[in-house]
Amino acid sequence: HFGRVDVLFNNAGIGAPAVPLETLSPAQWRAVVDTNLNGPFFCTQAAFRVMKAQTPRGGRIINNGSVSAHAPRPMTMPYTATKHAMTGLTKAASLDGRAWDIACGQIDIGNAMTEMARPMAEGILQADGRVASEPTIDVALVAQAVLDMARLPLSANVQFMTLMATKMPLVGRG
C-alpha cells in the first residue's frame, strides 16, 4: 500500500515434541527449521530487496531469537539449533545491511506468557531432570521492547537484547 518496508519483525517460531533425539523424525526436524530459520531468512531476503531500492533507502529488521540461543532446554535440539542459527542470521544481516542503512538486531525472549510458554508456567523438564514451573513475563513488555528497538534512528541499533523473567533459570538451565 505504501510501497515501503521500514521494519520487519521476524517473529515466527515453533518447537518439536520434547523427545529423545534418536526418536525425532526428519519431518519434525524440517518443520522447525523451515519455520524458525528458513522463514526468517526468506523474509529478510525480501525485505533487503525493498529496503535497498526504496527512497530513502534502509530499514530495520528485528529477529525474535530466544534464550535458547544461549542455553538449551532438555530435548529441544531442533528449536535450540534454529535459535542459535538465528543469531548467525542476525549478525550476517547486520553486517551485509550496513552499507545500505539496514539495521538488524535480535531480541532473545524468555518465557513471555504465550501459548508456547504456557507449559513452562505449568511445569517443564529442567536440566537436572526435575519438572518445575518457571516464571513468565507479560507479552506487553516484549511488545514495548520491540517497539523501542523499532523506533531507533537507523544510525543506532540494539544488536542483541535479552528480555526474560528475573527468576527464570537460564545459565546452565538450573
Kindly label every feature range from the protein language model.
Residues V19-L21, Q28-R30:
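Substrate-binding pocket helix/loop in short-chain dehydrogenase/reductase
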Residues E22, A71-M77, E134:
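Active-site loop immediately N-terminal to the catalytic Tyr-X3-Lys motif
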Residues R49, L95-R98:
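Alpha-helical segment proximal to the catalytic Tyr-Lys
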Residues S66:
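Residue(s) in the substrate-gating loop at a strand-loop-helix junction
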Residues Q106-I107, L125-G172:
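C-terminal helical subdomain
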